[in-house]
Amino acid sequence: MRSRRGATTSYILSKKVGFMFHYPHNHVEIRDAVAKLCTDFDGKYWQACDADRAYPSAFVKALTDAGYLSALIPEEYGGLSLPISAGAAILEEIHRSGGNAAACHAQMYTMGTVLRHGSDAQKQQYLPSIADGSLRLQAFGVTEPTSGTDTTALRTTARRDGDDYVVNGQKVWTSRAEYSDLMLLLARTTPLDQCAKKTDGLSVFLVDMREVRGKSLTITPIRTMMNHSSTQLFFDDMRIPASSLVGEEGK
């Protein structure tokens, strides 16, 4: 099993560069277990999802039940406390098996913002539910129609109003928003012309979309060549609790 993924690759590299290259632990047991799980979701399953523009709910549930989507979450919050290389191995194996990890990869890495920058209360409230799959954190609202790679030019605003923030603006190419309970949202809390640096004045929020979807949040699907669940989002005086702020305002 090692020779198939680890030693064989190392041998090929050694022939090219003239010395033996040793990979770190390649998570072979995890890869084999993920590959076995993926046999229940063959090409016909993925073709049907694409044909129907459907979200692979059964596949995501199977990954969640097996604990793979909580791989990077610490054990104290119900996760597996695995390193980032293990997360990469899981996603690689899904793709190697013919699946589509894009349907669920955000559940693994987006939570890192909460883990590294969230308050203790936010971690206790959200991470255990993200770990067991009862809450989906699949969406990350960053890109806008007028700001793609230049994130500092985004126009979505979040204005403090008492115990809330009021959000107005638009996001585009936000994947899986229709199938997510929570969303990380990047918005400007201080006008750009009032900031010493253009990277200042931006804040991150953890939005519970269940509370605002269909009211002050409108989600419109974008049809693309691939079944990637892309959407555009419209915020119309969307009111969220001040406790939704992750980390320090403007930083």
Label for each model-derived stretch:
Residues 153, 212-239:
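Flexible, small-/acidic-enriched active-site or ligand-binding loops
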Residues 67, 90-95, 186-188, 207-212, ...:
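Short Ser/Thr-interspersed hydrophobic loop/turn segments at strand-loop and sheet-helix junctions
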Residues 102-121, 148:
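N-terminal glycine-rich flavin-associated loop
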Residues 238-251:
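Long, acidic (Asp/Glu-rich), low-complexity accessory segments flanking structured domains
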Residues 2-104, 125, 129:
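Amphipathic, small/basic residue-rich leader segments at the start of a protein or domain
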Residues 133-142, 186:
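A short, Trp-centered hydrophobic/proline-enriched beta-strand micro-motif
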Residues 156-159:
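A structural signal for short hydrophobic beta-strand segments in well-ordered beta-sheet cores
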Residues 168-216:
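A short core secondary-structure module
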